[in-house]
C-alpha cells in the first residue's frame, strides 16, 4: 500500500465494518512507517505524507472513538527498540509534540489556551532526539527516544560529540537531571561527509537526519568521534527535588546554556500572536540561510506553572505545538548557473544553490530545464528562488522572488560553445534544446554514454559504477564501449582506491556481460530516443542485429512503439560511420548477442491488440509469466491505468489501480475470469 491508496478511498461511503477494517489497516501501515523512520532510519514515505495520514487516522478515531485500534501509533511515540542495543527506561516519558500545518491552526492552538500568554519560539531541528542523564552534575548515560518509555543506550557515542557537556558548568548541580535535545549534522558537514562516504564506501546518507541517527547507532565510537555531530538542547525531562526550576521556558533555556549546552540562536519570546506571525514569517524566509536543517517551528507556553495547569495528553504536552513547514517547496539562493552536457549532447542549465532541505533531502543543485525557462521565470544569479522536489524527481527552481533581488544579480546567457569540449552548440529549428556537436569527441558525452552502456537495464556491468567510469575516462583508459572489454588487472589496480579484489570483481562483471539479449544491446548502444520498450519491440520484430542494421524507415514506422522521430534517429544512427565502427568493435571483442526466440503468437480475441494492466498477486501465476503470456497473445502490457487502458487484470491486494480502473470505467477481470478467457 502507498499513501495515495489510503487517500484515494472515500471512507465516507464505507459501512461500519469496512470503516473498522480501513482504520485498522491505516493504523498498521502508520506503525510500519513509524518503525522504518524511528527505529532503523530507513523511511520510505515523506514526512508530509506521514503527517497527512496520521491526521486522517486521528480525525477518524475522533469521529468514531469506538473504532479506535489498540496499541496503535495514536498511543505511542517513535518506534520499537532495536534488539541489539541495551535498553534503559527514561526517568520521565519522552513524548512528542502535536503538529499543525497552517497559521490558522496555530492560531487555534493559541486561542484554546484561553490566557493572555507569551510563547517561547524556536526552530524545530530535524535530527535524532536524545536524553542525557546527569548525576551530581556529571554525564552518566545517554538514551535515544526509542518508544518514549525506554530507549537505546548510546552513551559512548554521545560522549564523542564535542559540544555535549561531560560535566555541568555549575558549582551547585542537581542530584539528578535529564537534559533533552536534538543531535544534528549541519548542512555543510553533511555534504562533506557524503562526499567522503561516496569516495571511500560507495554509499551516501539520504539526509542529515539519517546521517546523525546512523552515526549515533554505530558500534565503533572512534568512527563517530570523527563526524562533526552537534547537540542542540531544547528542554529537560526528569529532575530531582533539589533542582531549582526557573519560572519560564525562556529562562530554563538560558539556564541550560549557562550549564554548557548549545541552544538555538533563533529562539524568540513572543508576547502575543502578532509577534508569533512575525517570527513565523522571518524563519520561513531565513530557513535556507540556516546552517542546519529544520522542518518546522516549535511554540511553547512560556510560563512553567501555566504549562502544568494546561497539562498533557497520552502523546505529549498540550502547552506546546510544532508547526510543520510544507515539505515540497522552500526558498534558497542561486549562487551560480552552470551548463551540463548530457549523453545526447543536450545542454542543461543547472542552478548551484545555497544548500537547503527539500522533502527530507539536502539540495544544492536544481535543474533550470532550458534557457527559455530561465527567461520565462526571469531567474538570475544571486536571486532568491523557490525550489521544489516531489518524490524522487530531480529538484527544480519553480520561480524567482524578484522582490528580494540584489542590484548585482546577473542575467543568465546561453554559451555558444560547449563548456567541456569547446565544440559549437547548435539549436535546431529554434527549439528549447541546445546540443553540443562534439559527440564522442566530447568527454562529458563520452562519460555519460559509457555510464548508460554499463547500466543495469543495458549491459548490466554492475561492478563498473559511475565513479569508476569517470576515473577510467579521466585516465584515458576508455573512450569507446569496446575499450571496457580491453581493460586488464594492472590498469584497474593502478587506479586510486582500486585493490586486487575490487579489480577482479570488475573484470568478472565485464566477462559476465558478454552475452546480452538483443534488446539490451540495442538499448546499450544509445540510439537517441530508443528506450527499453522500443528496444524490446525492435529486437522482437527484427530478431537479429544484422536485420536491425539494414532496417528501412518504412519498415520501422510499422512497428508498435516506433514513431517517425525514433525511426529517423535509428536510420541516422546507422548512417554514421563512427557508430558502425563502435558496434563492430564490440562484436569483435567476443560480444555474443542472444537473439530472441521467435514466439508464435496465439490468437485470442480477448487480448489481441489490447492495452492491459496487471495488478495484485495471483495464486496460479507470477507477474513476469503472466506478462509474457499476454504479450504472446498480442497484448500490450503497461504499468499504469489511463483512459487508453482496455483491461485491468486484478489479483489479491489490487490497490489503487483497481480503484482508478473503476473510476475510469475500464473493464476489470479477476483471476477466475482470466482462466476462463485463457
From Swiss-Prot:
Its EC number is 6.5.1.2. It comes from the Bacteria. Zn(2+) binds at residues 418, 421, 436, 442. This is DNA ligase. One of its GO terms (molecular function) is DNA ligase (NAD+) activity. Disulfide bonds: none annotated. The keyword Disulfide bond does not apply. InterPro entries: BRCT_dom, BRCT_dom_sf, DisA/LigA_HHH, DNA_ligase, DNA_ligase_CS, DNAligase_adenylation, DNAligase_N, Hlx-hairpin-Hlx_DNA-bd_motif. Belongs to the NAD-dependent DNA ligase family. LigA subfamily. NAD(+) binds at residues 47-51, 96-97, 122, 145, 182, 300, 324. It catalyses: NAD(+) + (deoxyribonucleotide)n-3'-hydroxyl + 5'-phospho-(deoxyribonucleotide)m = (deoxyribonucleotide)n+m + AMP + beta-nicotinamide D-nucleotide. Keywords: DNA damage, DNA repair, DNA replication, Ligase, Magnesium, Manganese, Metal-binding, NAD, Zinc. PANTHER family: CHROMOSOME TRANSMISSION FIDELITY FACTOR 18 (PTHR23389), DNA LIGASE (PTHR23389:SF9). DNA ligase that catalyzes the formation of phosphodiester linkages between 5'-phosphoryl and 3'-hydroxyl groups in double-stranded DNA using NAD as a coenzyme and as the energy source for the reaction. It is essential for DNA replication and repair of damaged DNA. Its cofactor is Mg(2+); Mn(2+). Gene3D superfamilies: 5' to 3' exonuclease, C-terminal subdomain, 6.20.10.30, BRCT domain, DNA ligase/mRNA capping enzyme, Helix hairpin bin, Nucleic acid-binding proteins. The keyword Glycoprotein does not apply. GO terms for biological process: DNA repair; DNA replication. Pfam families: BRCT (PF00533), DNA_ligase_aden (PF01653), DNA_ligase_OB (PF03120), DNA_ligase_ZBD (PF03119), HHH_2 (PF12826). The active site is at 124 (n6-amp-lysine intermediate). Residues 602-678 form the BRCT domain.
Amino acid at each position: 500500500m502507498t499513501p495515495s491508496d489510503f487517500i484515494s478511498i472515500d471512507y465516507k461511503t464505507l459501512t461500519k465494518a469496512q470503516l473498522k477494517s480501513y482504520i485498522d489497516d491505516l493504523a498498521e501501515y502508520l506503525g510500519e512507517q513509524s518503525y522504518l523512520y524511528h527505529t532503523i532510519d530507513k523511511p520510505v514515505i515523506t514526512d508530509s505524507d506521514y503527517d497527512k495520514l496520521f491526521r486522517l487516522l486521528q480525525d477518524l478515531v475522533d469521529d468514531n472513538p469506538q473504532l479506535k485500534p489498540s496499541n496503535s501509533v495514536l498511543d505511542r511515540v517513535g518506534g520499537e527498540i532495536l534488539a541489539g542495543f541495551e535498553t534503559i527506561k527514561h526517568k520521565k516519558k519522552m513524548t512528542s509534540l502535536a503538529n499543525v500545518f497552517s497559521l490558522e491552526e496555530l492560531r487555534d492552538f493559541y486561542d484554546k489556551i484561553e490566557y493572555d500568554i507569551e510563547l517561547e519560539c524556536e526552530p524545530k531541528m530535524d535530527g535524532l532526539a536524545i536524553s542525557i542523564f546527569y548525576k551530581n552534575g556529571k554525564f552518566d548515560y545517554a538514551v535515544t527516544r526509542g518508544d518514549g518509555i525506554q530507549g537505546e543506550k548510546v552513551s559512548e557515542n554521545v560522549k564523542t560529540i564535542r559540544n555535549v557537556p561531560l560535566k555541568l558548568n555549575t558549582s551547585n548541580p542537581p542530584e539528578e537531571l535529564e537534559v533533552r535535545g536534538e543531535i544534528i549534522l549541519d548542512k555543510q558537514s553533511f555534504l562533506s561527509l557524503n562526499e567522503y562516504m561516496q569516495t571511500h564506501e560507495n554509499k551516501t546518507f539520504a539526509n542529515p537526519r539519517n546521517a546523525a541517527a546512523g552515526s549515533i547507532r554505530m558500534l565503533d565510537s572512534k568512527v563517530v568521534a570523527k563526524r562533526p555531530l552537534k547537540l542542540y538542547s531544547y528542554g529537560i525531562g526528569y529532575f530531582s527535588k533539589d533542582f531549582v526550576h526557573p519560572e519560564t521556558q525562556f529562562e530554563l533555556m538560558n539556564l541550560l546554556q549557562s550549564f554548557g549546552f548549545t541552544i538555538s540562536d533563533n529562539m524568540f519570546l513572543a508576547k502575543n500572536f502578532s509577534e508569533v506571525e512575525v517570527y513565523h514569517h522571518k524563519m520561513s524566509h531565513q530557513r535556507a540561510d540556516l546552517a542546519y536543517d529544520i522542518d518546522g517551528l516549535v511554540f511553547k507556553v512560556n510560563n512553567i506553572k501555566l504549562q502544568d495547569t494546561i497539562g498533557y495528553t497520552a502523546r505529549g504536552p498540550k502547552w506546546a505545538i510544532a508547526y510543520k513547514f510544507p515539505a515540497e517547496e522552500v526558498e534558497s539562493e542561486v549562487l551560480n548557473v552552470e551548463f551540463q552536457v548530457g549523453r545526447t549532447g543536450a545542454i542543461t542549465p543547472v542552478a548551484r544553490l545555497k544548500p537547503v532541505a527539500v522533502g527530507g533531502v539536502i539540495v544544492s543543485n536544481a535543474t533550470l530545464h532550458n534557457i527559455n525557462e530561465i527567461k520565462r521565470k526571469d531567474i538570475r544569479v544571486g536571486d532568491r528562488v523557490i525550489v521544489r522536489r516531489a518524490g524522487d524527481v530531480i529538484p527544480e527552481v519553480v520561480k524567482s522572488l524578484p522582490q528580494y533581488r540584489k542590484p548585482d544579480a546577473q542575467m543568465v546567457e546561453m554559451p555558444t560553445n560547449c563548456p567541456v569540449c569547446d565544440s559549437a552548440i547548435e539549436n535546431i529549428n529554434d527549439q528549447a534544446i541546445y546540443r553540443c556537436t562534439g559527440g564522442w569527441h566530447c568527454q562529458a558525452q563520452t562519460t555519460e554514454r559509457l555510464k548508460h552502456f554499463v547500466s543495469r537495464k543495458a549491459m548490466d556491468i554492475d561492478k563498473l559504477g559511475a565513479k569508476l567510469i569517470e576515473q577510467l575516462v579521466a585516465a584515458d583508459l576508455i573512450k569507446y564501449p569496446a575499450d571496457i572489454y580491453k581493460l586488464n588487472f594492472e590498469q584497474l589496480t593502478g587506479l586510486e582506491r582500486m585493490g586486487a579484489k575490487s579489480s577482479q570483481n570488475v573484470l568478472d562483471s565485464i566477462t559476465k556481460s558478454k552475452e546480452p539479449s538483443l534488446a539490451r544491446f540495442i538499448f546499450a548502444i544509445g540510439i537517441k530516443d530508443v528506450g527499453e520498450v522500443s528496444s524490446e519491440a525492435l529486437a522482437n520484430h527484427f530478431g537479429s542485429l544484422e536485420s536491425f542494421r539494414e532496417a528501412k524507415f518504412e519498415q520501422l514506422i510499422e512497428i508498435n512503439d516506433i514513431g517517425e522521430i525514433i525511426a529517423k534517429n535509428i536510420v541516422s544512427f546507422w548512417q554514421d560511420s563512427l557508430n558502425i565502427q563502435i558496434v563492430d568493435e564490440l562484436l569483435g571483442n567476443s560480444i555474443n548477442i542472444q537473439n530472441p526466440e521467435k514466439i508464435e503468437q496465439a490468437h485470442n480475441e480477448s487480448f489481441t491488440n489490447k492495452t492491459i494492466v496487471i495488478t495484485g498477486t495471483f495464486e496460479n501465476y507470477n507477474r513476469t509469466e503472466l506478462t509474457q503470456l499476454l504479450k504472446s497473445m498480442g497484448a500490450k502490457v503497461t504499468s499504469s491505468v489511463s483512459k487508453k487502458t482496455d483491461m485491468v487484470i486484478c489479483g489479491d491486494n489490487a490497490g489503487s489501480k483497481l480503484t482508478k480502473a473503476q473510476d475510469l470505467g475500464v473493464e476489470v477481470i479477476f483471476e477466475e475470469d482470466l482462466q476462463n478467457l485463457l
